[in-house]
UniProtKB/Swiss-Prot annotation:
Residues 83-178 form the Toprim domain. The keyword DNA damage applies. A zinc finger (C4-type) spans 60-75. This is Recombination protein RecR. Keywords: DNA damage, DNA recombination, DNA repair, Metal-binding, Zinc, Zinc-finger. It comes from Rhizobium johnstonii (strain DSM 114642 / LMG 32736 / 3841) (Rhizobium leguminosarum bv. viciae). The lineage of its organism: Bacteria, Pseudomonadati, Pseudomonadota, Alphaproteobacteria, Hyphomicrobiales. CDD domains: TOPRIM_recR. May play a role in DNA repair. It seems to be involved in an RecBC-independent recombinational process of DNA repair. It may act with RecF and RecO. The keyword Cell membrane does not apply. GO terms for molecular function: DNA binding; zinc ion binding. Pfam families: RecR_C, RecR_HhH, Toprim_4. Belongs to the RecR family.
């Protein structure tokens, strides 16, 4: 059995870093060592920023985004088209769409997808909040931007069913060939989706 070569504080730092998605035990050790070597330039400021985030970050009561204000800056941005809502599974999806910069719309974060096998039902997600937002009026389009998984498609169909009878256009993201992708490397499902979502040029 290997002997411990660091104190409990450093071990705790490594264990906590290893819980971050994308970091395993080895990567966590490297990250911890890098932070410790750059104690004044990185570890101190990171510790301060994390403390501030812990104290100030909240979930937007309107859309489910994370921010330091409620409602969040996306919901209060008068430059956005608040009549169009892009529905996403998670905050990371919202951030990804914002990086793309293709639309200047509002968002609604569901907090996951329906998954009966995992015990995730409609009441476990932020679906009621979405239905309430649409019911308030002023929404002309919902863009369902969930992942192309069975759970994502089930969630999209459930939302569509719940909004039947309301005067709102419901669309979903096109699925298909990625920019720069080669047809020979794509699976049959992706190719079929691309053919169905074809557009006029």
């Amino acid at each position: 059995m290997a002997k411990r070569v660091t104190g409990p504080e450093i071990e705790k730092l490594i264990q906590l870093l290893a819980k971050v998605p994308g970091l395993g035990p080895r990567s966590a050790r490297r990250a911890a060592l890098h932070l410790i070597k750059k104690k004044d330039q990185l570890l101190g400021p990171l510790s301060h920023a994390m403390g501030e985030a812990y104290d100030k970050v909240k979930i937007c009561s309107r859309c489910g985004n994370v921010d330091t204000v409620d409602p969040c800056i996306v919901c209060t941005d008068v430059q956005r088209d608040q009549s169009v809502i892009i529905v996403v599974e998670d905050v990371s999806d919202l951030w990804a769409l914002e990086r793309a910069g293709a639309m200047n719309a509002a968002y609604h974060v569901l907090g996951g997808t329906l998954s009966p096998l995992d015990g995730v039902g409609p009441d476990d997600l932020n679906i009621r909040g979405l239905i309430d937002r649409v019911g308030e009026g002023g929404i002309r389009e919902l863009i369902i931007a969930v992942n192309a998984t069975v759970e994502g498609q089930t969630t999209a169909h459930y939302i569509t069913d719940q909004l039947q009878g309301l005067d709102v256009k419901i669309t979903r993201l096109a699925h298909g060939v990625p920019v720069g992708g080669e047809l020979d490397y794509l699976d049959e499902g992706t190719l079929a989706a691309a053919l169905r979502a074809r557009t006029v040029i």
